[in-house]
Amino acid sequence: MASPNGGDDFESSLLSFEKLDRASPDLWPEQLPGVVEFAASCKNPITDSPPKWMAELESEDYEMLKELGSLTTANLMEKVRGLQNLAYQLGLEESREMTRGKFLNILESFKK
């Protein structure tokens, strides 16, 4: 057991200043290809300005984020299910309108 006075020396002897990077793909294969490049391209949100998508948020958007963050898992899944149903209904409506446009010949390109 280390003495109280020699504890710092023991801990400092365990430190390693070796830099472990992925310079050798044979020794350190990347678990998920592209993750290292992606992580390097991301900026630190603490020191840098907020990303562009966050700068364009309005107060209503923040309220929606807070509301979604406060939902339980079941409620969030119900919300997602509702959005999927809405997207499906919009797709059906768009399909009907495209078919209608085809029958009315308003989508044909002008032939010269």
Swiss-Prot record:
Looking at the record's lineage, which domain of life comes first? Eukaryota
**Pfam families per the UniProt record, alphabetical:** LIN52
Cite the InterPro entries for this sequence.
DREAM_LIN52
Q: Which GO biological process categories is it annotated with?
A: regulation of DNA-templated transcription
Q: An example Gene Ontology cellular component term from the record?
A: DRM complex
Binding partners and assembly = Component of the DREAM complex.
Give the family this protein belongs to, as stated in its UniProt record: Belongs to the lin-52 family.
Task: Identify this protein by name.
Answer: Protein lin-52 homolog
Species whose genome carries this gene: Tetraodon nigroviridis (Spotted green pufferfish)
